Each structure stands twice: as structure tokens, then as C-alpha cells.
Regions:
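Phosphate-binding/switch region of NTP-binding enzymes
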Residues: 119-188
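Active-site-adjacent loop/helix micro-motif of nuclease/hydrolase catalytic cores
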Residues: 26-30, 105-112, 137-138
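Alpha-helical scaffold elements adjacent to nucleotide-binding pockets in ATP/GTP-utilizing enzyme cores
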Residues: 56-60, 112-116, 144-148
Length: 188
């Protein structure tokens, strides 16, 4: 709901989202902003595999005011899929699981990931971040995940564009960072 609805529509609650983008396109910031918004609807686990809890990640947490949702937003690092399954089997586990990024998962097969995670937890929403190489999701598993997800978002120039099933306006976008987007599209 709110400012993202024109770009993303109203996805169903137990949906899988795929978010990709080139390096320095605003993808990680967008994924974290989405996680913050999802805290309005339930608990969020942010599985930070690509960055861990490095300095840029910590700065982003501070810059985006994630302390405002500290009770609902949990950052976890270094998990295997088996660890994540064990975590999600616990009572009062996260309603929303963000994995950033899928290229760092210890599972390399989409079929296995679907069986071990998605099929096992049909009442959880999964938001899956992915790297891009030459305009495509990097790796076969990322490409398969993209195909499977109902919401597909591509970040470019600090804007997030929905390519999924829930928006009627293919030109609509969500601005991740006003100043960065203005500079990017002014020089494009």
C-alpha cells in the first residue's frame, strides 16, 4: 500500500518476489526499504549472504532508520538453507524472508531450493535478491527463480521497475533515491 502501489500493485501475501539489478543500481537499498515496509505486516528475516554485516551494510541500516523496526526486522548472516529451514520451523518465525543474494546460497539447484524452502513454507513470503550479469540474472538458478516468482522487480538508476503480474502500468516505478535517480537519468 502507499507510494509503492502504482509500481508494484497489490501482490498476494504469500508471494515470492525476485529483485535484481546491476551493481550500484540501488538494489540493496530497495530490498532493505521493502523489508522495513513489510514490518507493518509481520516479522522479517533479512538473510544477508552477499554483504554479511560489513560496514556498507551497517551504514545502510543506520541511513534507512532500521532501528525503528528493530523488534520485527532481524538480520541473520552465514546461514545455510538447512539453517534457514530450522529457523523457519520455530514458533513465531518470520512471515517474510529476504535472501540477499541467491548467488550466495549453498544450494545450486532451483528444484532443490523449491522443495526444501518454498514448498515447505507455503505460508511465508520470500523476497529473493539477485546479481545481474550482462542484463540477465547471474546463473541458471537465479534465472529459474526469476521465472517462478510472481513479482519481478528490476532496479536501474536508483529506480525499481515491476515486471510482474500485479501492475497494469509497465512504465511505473518506485524511486529508491531521488538525488541518485536525478543524476542517472539526466546523464543517460
Amino acid at each position: 500500500d502507499g507510494e509503492g502501489e502504482p509500481a508494484f500493485g497489490r501482490p498476494s501475501r504469500f508471494e515470492r518476489w525476485f529483485i535484481d539489478g546491476e551493481s550500484a543500481s540501488g538494489k540493496s537499498t530497495f530490498v532493505m526499504l521493502l523489508g522495513k515496509k513489510l514490518c507493518d505486516y509481520g516479522r522479517v528475516d533479512y538473510v544477508s549472504l552477499e554483504e554479511g554485516a560489513n560496514l556498507s551494510f551497517k551504514k545502510r541500516i543506520k541511513r534507512l532508520g532500521m532501528k525503528d523496526v528493530a523488534g520485527k526486522f532481524k538480520v541473520v548472516t552465514g546461514l545455510t538453507v538447512a539453517d534457514l529451514v530450522a529457523r523457519l520451523e520455530r514458533p513465531k518465525s518470520a512471515n517474510f524472508v529476504i535472501i540477499d543474494s541467491v548467488q550466495y546460497l549453498d544450494v545450486r539447484s532451483f528444484d532443490r531450493l523449491k522443495k526444501e524452502l518454498f514448498d515447505r513454507f507455503p505460508r511465508k513470503s520470500f523476497i529473493l535478491g539477485a546479481q545481474v550479469y550482462k542484463g540477465r540474472p547471474k546463473g541458471k538458478m537465479a534465472d529459474d527463480i526469476r521465472f517462478d516468482c510472481g513479482v519481478k522487480i528490476h532496479t536501474k538508476g536508483y529506480r525499481a521497475y515491476c515486471q510482474g503480474r500485479y501492475t497494469d502500468d509497465a512504465e511505473a516505478y518506485f524511486t529508491i533515491w531521488e538525488e541518485g535517480a536525478a543524476k542517472y537519468y539526466l546523464t543517460e
